[in-house]
């Protein structure tokens, strides 16, 4: 067998004008070769066809450019038949194998084409030498070897039995009807990778093969032979030379690796090679609008494309669903509040009435009468016709379907109705009053009248029953309004709630700690608030219980102390032991109103009562002088200023006692002592106290206290000792904040009375009780002898029988400055502040006795330091 070698190297071409010239030249030479082959037989025709392909390749090689594109040169039918005839001479296993490869749409290597044609030429030469077959026999053999391709079944029409075809990346899957060996042969190809980009070479282009091959080994594939994508690679640079080394000619040769070093298709030169993106497919090009079918597969039918699109949509939908599920699962895991955990009470701003409320909020019977449709009225006919016209405009297609029944409607509406006599009477309100319905066909009543009468009777009964039920619900609500909670009633008084509209469900949602016009609390918030409210209520109740217990205990103690006061008074209050008990009791309980006047007289002047009889001016005598004289105007205005300054602008002022107070002050002004600091406060509080029955008692006790407890010696000691930097008061008020107050102009006896002006009457009397008792004298050991004191003045009496106790006054001032120094700057400023200010401040929830007792305890604590 003579071998043929191709002298020229193939070069890539561009498919522009060169492609059209190359195709035209190839077709012309192919036709000449086909005609010649028909005359000379299968062998000669094959060679002529081969020459035609070679000539076409040379023509394309002459117009080659730097870009490589895929080129398929069409061949004539006679050319294909000549090649088929040459292939039909193959016998034995080669014949069956070649027929199987050609008859099935499966890819084949270029080396397989070469091996097949070499075998066919070698068998043809042996047949020519032995006589061979005639062309007709060859054609018959070809017809038997290559059957007419039949359209595969629906399962085999798709190239793979699995869903690999429907993936996004095109793959070279085997045909469903192909065998396993064909599948291996189809994938047993050589790929060229690395830095050079490879493209698919056209089957009509010749290869530059080694010198061991002859020209007869170059085969042009027929229309049933295919070239696997990626089996051949051509570089973009036109100057590059390629060397193809066929390692093995049989069908079972192994695939060539895709590395640059081991590739059988190597670049000898041509450094300027085209680069491709990593991951890009270099096997073949196809349209995005069609399926990823290789050139070796047939075009898909519409049903196949539909199945492909459906499968791709399902895959994309499943992928999207999985992504969304994953996203929402991640989001749900981060949410603090799930939808299931949303409390229904949070949706509060939607006005919804319960059935018990909405039952009597419906329209009354008069409104229902207006809404009833009268069929015989022409106005109702126009309304119905207008509704039908509007419906025709909105739903033209739907109304066309029912157009047969619509023309009959105006006739029924315009047809005069015979109304029975009983329907023109009063409407029926009870089911028992409904008359017997006439039987259609027997009575002289049409079907329309029968239905209309029945509907009207039932409607009137239903409306009446609804009205009665609404009236009953309304009466029930009105009767239950008096049992509603107080907070709801308060909102009704403010015009923010209607008691009739308050249902049981609303009462369940409303909480007592929030107004009804505000949004209700959530379940969690309501439970938390109820827990806190119950806790505070428990604390308040415990405190109230303790307060009541202490009040009860204090009342019992006061009662016992009052009995002790009476017992001490009977036993002798001027005894030393009695005075000790009296001092102890006075810090716990004030003297009772019944015993105060007698105790004051006994403690301050003993049972002899020498001071009242000798050193005090008589009340009746001064009053008679006042009646006989014209009281000076300037003195009267001075008294009014004193009352306004010390009494009127202070707490507890009452205008009822103004005349008595003015009289006492006038009497004091015309006395030998004259008006003194504190007279107005003493007279005013004694007048408001029940301990003194007459003005004479008040006059004597007030003057007695002024002469004994607040005498001149006590005043001088108070003014000098209270501002002494080494005194007890200075040590108690050692804070730098009191430095500005420790002056003689601020801390003195006159400013001390500013404190007494701000004290309530009950506490004032208790303070006076303590001051009087702390200034007591043990007259049992020092009994007063009237004969010895007959010629003695008041100063002698004070030095011998009066106790000077300025410490009780200084301790009171220190206690007020330490514990109640708020609302005023100093004792001098205390005179000019609001008249409602008092010491101590009282609250409505706290008992006055408890506050007064607390004040006395603090004062006693400071007095112990003196």
UniProtKB/Swiss-Prot annotation:
Keywords tagged on the record:
Cell wall biogenesis/degradation, Golgi apparatus, Protein transport, Transport
Per the record's keyword annotation, is Protein transport included, yes or no? yes
Question: Biased-composition ranges for Polar residues?
Answer: 153-180, 189-199, 273-282, 397-408
Q: Where in the cell is it found?
A: Golgi apparatus
Q: Where is this region: Disordered?
A: 24-49, 72-94, 119-199, 249-282, 390-424
Question: Which GO CC terms are listed, alphabetically?
Answer: Golgi apparatus
One Pfam family named in its UniProt record: SBE2_N
Bias-annotated ranges (Low complexity): 79-94, 252-263
What's a BP term from Gene Ontology annotated to this protein? protein transport
* Role, per record: With SBE22, is involved in cell wall integrity and polarity processes like bud growth.
Family designation: Belongs to the SBE2 family.
| Official protein name in the record | Protein SBE2
Give the originating organism. Answer: Candida glabrata (strain ATCC 2001 / BCRC 20586 / JCM 3761 / NBRC 0622 / NRRL Y-65 / CBS 138)
Gene that encodes the chain? SBE2
């Amino acid at each position: 067998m003579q071998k043929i070698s191709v002298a020229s190297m193939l070069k890539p071409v561009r498919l522009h004008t060169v492609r059209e010239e190359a195709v035209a030249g190839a077709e012309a030479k192919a036709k000449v070769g086909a005609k010649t082959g028909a005359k000379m037989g299968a062998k000669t025709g094959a060679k002529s066809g081969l020459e035609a392909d070679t000539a076409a390749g040379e023509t394309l090689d002459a117009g080659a450019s730097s870009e490589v594109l895929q080129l398929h040169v069409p061949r004539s039918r006679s050319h294909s038949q000549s090649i088929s005839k040459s292939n039909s001479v193959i016998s034995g296993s080669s014949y069956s194998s070649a027929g199987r490869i050609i008859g099935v749409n499966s890819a084949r290597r270029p080396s397989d084409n070469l091996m097949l044609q070499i075998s066919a030429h070698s068998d043809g030469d042996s047949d020519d030498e032995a006589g061979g077959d005639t062309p007709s026999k060859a054609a018959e053999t070809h017809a038997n070897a290559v059957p007419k391709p039949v359209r595969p079944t629906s399962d085999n029409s798709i190239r793979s039995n699995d869903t690999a075809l429907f993936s996004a990346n095109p793959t070279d899957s085997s045909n469903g009807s192909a065998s396993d060996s064909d599948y291996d042969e189809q994938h047993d190809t050589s790929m060229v990778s690395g830095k050079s980009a490879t493209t698919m070479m056209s089957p009509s282009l010749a290869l530059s093969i080694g010198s061991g091959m002859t020209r007869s080994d170059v085969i042009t594939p027929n229309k049933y032979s295919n070239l696997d994508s990626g089996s051949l690679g051509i570089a973009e640079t036109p100057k590059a030379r390629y060397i193809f080394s066929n390692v093995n000619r049989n069908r079972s040769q192994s695939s060539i690796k895709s590395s640059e070093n081991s590739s059988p298709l190597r670049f000898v030169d041509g450094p300027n090679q085209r680069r491709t993106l990593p991951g890009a497919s270099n096997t073949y090009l196809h349209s995005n609008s069609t399926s990823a079918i290789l050139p070796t597969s047939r075009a898909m039918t519409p049903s196949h494309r539909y199945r492909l699109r459906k499968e791709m949509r399902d895959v994309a939908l499943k992928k999207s669903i999985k992504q969304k599920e994953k996203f929402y699962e991640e989001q749900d895991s981060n949410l603090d509040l799930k939808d299931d955990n949303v409390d229904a009470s949070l949706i509060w701003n939607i006005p919804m009435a319960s059935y018990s409320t909405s039952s009597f909020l419906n329209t009354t019977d008069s409104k229902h009468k207006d809404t009833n449709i009268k069929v015989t009225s022409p106005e109702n006919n126009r309304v119905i016709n207008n509704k039908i016209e509007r419906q025709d405009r909105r739903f033209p297609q739907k109304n066309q379907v029912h157009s047969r029944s619509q023309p009959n409607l105006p006739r029924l509406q315009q047809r005069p109705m015979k109304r029975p006599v009983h329907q023109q009477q009063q409407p029926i309100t009870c089911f028992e009053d409904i008359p017997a319905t006439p039987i259609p066909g027997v009575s002289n009543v049409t079907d329309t009248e029968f239905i209309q009468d029945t509907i009207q009777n039932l409607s009137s009964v239903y409306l009446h029953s609804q009205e009665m039920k609404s009236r009953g619900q309304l009466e029930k609500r009105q009767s239950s309004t008096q049992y509603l909670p107080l907070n709801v009633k308060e909102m009704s008084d403010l015009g923010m709630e209607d008691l009739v509209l308050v249902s049981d469900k609303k009462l369940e949602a409303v909480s007592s700690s929030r107004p009804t016009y505000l949004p209700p609390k959530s379940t969690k918030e309501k439970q938390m608030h109820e827990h806190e409210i119950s806790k505070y209520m428990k604390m308040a109740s415990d405190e109230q219980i303790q307060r009541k217990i202490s009040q009860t205990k204090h009342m019992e103690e006061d009662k016992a102390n009052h009995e002790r006061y009476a017992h001490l008074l009977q036993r002798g209050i001027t005894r030393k032991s009695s005075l000790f008990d009296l001092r102890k009791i006075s810090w716990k309980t004030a003297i009772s109103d019944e015993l105060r006047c007698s105790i004051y007289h006994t403690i301050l002047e003993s049972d002899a009562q020498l001071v009242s009889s000798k050193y005090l001016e008589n009340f009746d005598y001064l009053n008679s002088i006042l009646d006989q004289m014209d009281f000076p105007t300037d003195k009267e205005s001075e008294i009014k200023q004193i009352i306004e300054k010390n009494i009127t602008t202070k707490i507890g002022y009452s205008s009822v006692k103004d005349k008595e107070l003015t009289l006492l002050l006038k009497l004091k002004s015309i006395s030998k002592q004259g008006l003194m600091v504190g007279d107005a406060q003493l007279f005013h509080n004694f007048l408001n106290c029940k301990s003194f029955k007459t003005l004479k008692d008040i006059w004597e006790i007030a003057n007695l206290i002024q002469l004994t407890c607040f005498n001149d010696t006590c005043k001088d000691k108070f003014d000098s000792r209270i501002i002494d930097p080494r005194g007890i008061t200075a040590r108690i008020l050692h804070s730098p904040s009191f430095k500005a107050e420790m002056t003689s102009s601020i801390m003195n006896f006159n400013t001390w009375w500013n404190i007494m002006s701000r004290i309530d009457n009950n506490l004032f009397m208790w303070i006076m009780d303590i001051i009087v008792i702390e200034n007591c004298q043990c007259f049992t050991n020092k009994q007063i002898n009237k004969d010895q004191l007959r010629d003695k003045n008041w100063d002698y009496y004070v030095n011998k029988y009066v106790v000077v106790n300025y410490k009780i006054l200084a301790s009171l001032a220190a206690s007020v400055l330490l514990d109640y120094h708020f609302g005023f700057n100093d004792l001098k400023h205390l005179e000019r502040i609001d008249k409602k200010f008092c010491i101590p401040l009282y609250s409505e929830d706290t008992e006055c006795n408890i506050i007064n007792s607390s004040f006395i305890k603090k004062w006693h604590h400071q007095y112990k330091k003196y």
